């Protein structure tokens, strides 16, 4: 038993005690290549708007909890009716998006810069399909562009009132004088 423990002590000292380390370069160019500065928090206060699919107050609680776990978040506002989440703080946009997606919610950056002014009917609010698909944020998998547009007929942005569609070529019952 003494000889076996002696051999195991020697093998431990030779092989496992000093792990293999990366070689240190003395050249400045190699140091700059291998040692980059860690990413710090953004220098300015940022406001990040997200469009998150939420159906109840439980979903709202899950989203808030996931965002408040991030370092640098000052405040989180959730508008459940519009499915909009506004985050204010010293945090990066992609980290917030990734945290919400890890919580199990479908999320994307808010595609509408301000309240829409050109829609005339409440059925068409927030249905602008021109900017829904963003390839760089993996919206094909996580976004809203898969099931919404399947089988739906395209509705023009002119609205449902009769006066705006009176001379429209797409309207079957339009004026035939033109």
Swiss-Prot record:
Residue numbers covered by the propeptide annotation in the UniProt entry: 176-178
Pfam families, per the entry: HMA (PF00403)
Keywords assigned: Lipoprotein, Metal-binding, Methylation, Prenylation
Binding site residues for a metal cation: 56, 59
SUPFAM superfamilies, A to Z: HMA, heavy metal-associated domain
InterPro entries (alphabetical): HMA_dom, HMA_dom_sf
Modified residues (Cysteine methyl ester): 175
GO molecular function terms attached to this record: metal ion binding
Lipidation feature positions (S-farnesyl cysteine): 175
Residues annotated as domain HMA: 45-108
Function: Heavy-metal-binding protein.
Stated family: Belongs to the HIPP family.
Subunit structure, interactors included: Interacts with ZHD3/HB21, ZHD11/HB29 and ZHD8/HB30.
Protein name: Heavy metal-associated isoprenylated plant protein 30
């Amino acid at each position: 038993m003494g000889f076996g423990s002696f051999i195991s002590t020697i093998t431990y000292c030779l092989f496992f005690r000093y792990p293999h380390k990366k070689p240190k370069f003395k050249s400045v160019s190699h140091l700059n290549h291998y040692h980059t500065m860690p990413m710090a928090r953004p220098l300015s206060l940022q406001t990040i708007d997200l469009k998150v699919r939420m159906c109840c107050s439980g979903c709202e609680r899950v989203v808030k909890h996931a965002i408040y776990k991030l370092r640098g978040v000052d405040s989180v506002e959730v508008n459940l009716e519009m499915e909009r989440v506004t985050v204010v703080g010293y945090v990066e946009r992609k980290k917030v998006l990734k945290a919400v997606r890890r919580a199990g919610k479908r999320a994307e950056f808010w595609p509408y810069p301000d309240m829409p002014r050109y829609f005339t009917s409440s059925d068409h609010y927030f249905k602008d399909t021109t900017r829904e698909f963003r390839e760089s944020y993996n919206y094909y998998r996580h976004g809203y562009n898969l099931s919404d547009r399947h089988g739906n007929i395209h509705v023009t942005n002119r609205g449902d009132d009769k006066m705006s569609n009176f001379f429209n070529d797409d309207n079957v019952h339009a004026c035939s004088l033109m």
